[in-house]
């Protein structure tokens, strides 16, 4: 896996998402309900469904550590596995590494621009779902943010240096106008 271009001509990106990617690869399996659903589509033969029923990733993963600067056209993750196994994990790896690397990179740029002043993450209200909020806050922390308004992320990572960063609700704005 590699990327071709750094967003906004930034020179480099910050690797993030590896922890979730490895966890996904380790735990990927197909439940009976999954197999039954695929069987109901009428396009998969029994041999393939049996393969999925017993699936366990057998490949090797080589990756750049999280928080490391990465550059265009250089491998950030390599999967050495049978093609079918690599294909089964490809989409999740792309969406996870791309999403978190983008956020970690932007956070890192903001932190560097702040020149030593603390930067806190408040992205949960704009995230596309609860998992994206937690993963995004985690990525911002990897990028250098000192804390998050996402209480769940703070609980999981213990990343906020303060008691609670909180957030500023839209209703507060309306009341003060």
Where are each of the predicted segments found?
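Buried, small/hydrophobic-residue-enriched core segments of structured protein domains
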Residues: 5-7, 43, 49-58, 66-177
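N-terminal, charged/glycine-rich beta-strand/loop interface patches
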Residues: 26, 58-60
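Intrinsically disordered, low-complexity, positively charged segments
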Residues: 1-43
